[in-house]
Amino acid sequence: MTERTLILIKPDGVKNGHVGEIISRIEKKGLKLVELDLRTADRETAEKHYAEHSDKPFFGELVDFITSAPLVAGIVEGESAIAAWRQLAGGTHPVEKATPGTIRGDFALTVGENVVHGSDSPESAEREIGIWFPNL
């Protein structure tokens, strides 16, 4: 089934020069980039995006990090795009769960700065795309 998913290349991925390689991996996976935007997220957008974590002790740090510098927000489309992107991204915790050869396995050093984000379900994708690309 053709799906769309939100992707974020977080500030650490932009700062460390991984944007080109990440986009290349997306295209090699057969996924299509339908939107791509370099921007610095504002607090309101970040807080909406991470609302499910608002009661967690790391929420403030997460919002501070994602708004600290430019990131790339995008929409990727393709067959089972959500699962395909999550497979490319690798596990959330780069040391314990991200396999070498995945984006996080190759580029991330900590769970807090783990290079990329991707929606985890069709419902999350719809919600997150609406937050980052409200005019679509």
Swiss-Prot record:
Chief place of localization: cytoplasm
GO cellular component terms, semicolon-separated: cytoplasm
UniProt catalytic activity: a 2'-deoxyribonucleoside 5'-diphosphate + ATP = a 2'-deoxyribonucleoside 5'-triphosphate + ADP; a ribonucleoside 5'-diphosphate + ATP = a ribonucleoside 5'-triphosphate + ADP
Keyword terms, alphabetized: ATP-binding, Cytoplasm, Kinase, Magnesium, Metal-binding, Nucleotide metabolism, Nucleotide-binding, Phosphoprotein, Transferase
Pfam families: NDK (PF00334)
Gene3D superfamilies assigned: Nucleoside diphosphate kinase-like domain (3.30.70.141)
Organism superkingdom: Bacteria
Active site per UniProt: H117
Subunit structure: Homotetramer.
Family: Belongs to the NDK family.
Listed name of the protein: Nucleoside diphosphate kinase
